[in-house]
């Protein structure tokens, strides 16, 4: 949908008082970047990330092709396994890729920090259903904080799963990261109870068990 429609929408609660995951926040962040840099989001993505990360087959798509629609930032990335693993490598290595500094280490740390803080977290969020985790610091900036070090409060496993079967994750404690893609036909929640979204963490657990 156009940004003008988004900005006319009313907030449903005071910012910072409650956590509720949703792609609208990503749309607003994308528009903020456009205004600050005076460039369209796709141009920013290509110049700042895709090109230096050699993601030659990656771009963002709008919700539909009718015209007048902004890129869909929460789920609208068209990419490949090989392209996306370059991005994960950069995040895993604290902002560097092939010796090039893409993001500052401080930026990556802030992305993975607890952004929920004292906000109310309602039952049934992703980490609770998928991992049985009931901690409140479940989300950073565009990343789920799946597994937390109880002593430091730092997330040692982060992810950004998609409803249609994409599961990228990084586990810093086990020194492993990966990207699993599955083609899911129809709704992600099947009649037999399987959900490609909530079932994703079994992949990271299996990989960690193998590398150990």
Which positions does each model-derived feature cover?
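Catalytic-site signature segments of enzymes, centered on catalytic residues
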Residues: 4-81, 85
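Surface-exposed patches in mature extracellular/periplasmic domains of secreted proteins
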Residues: 98-103
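Acidic helix/loop microenvironments that form the catalytic cleft of cell-wall polysaccharide enzymes
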Residues: 50-54, 108, 112-116
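C-terminal soluble interaction/assembly domains
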Residues: 180-187
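Residue-level signal for well-ordered alpha-helical scaffold segments within enzymatic catalytic domains
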Residues: 31, 35, 47, 86-90, ...
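Short, gly/Ser/Thr-rich active-site loops of penicillin-recognizing serine hydrolases
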Residues: 120-124, 148, 187-212
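Generic structural signal for alpha-helix termini and adjacent loop/cap motifs
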Residues: 90-94, 114
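Active-site Gly/Thr loop motif
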Residues: 57-82, 113-179
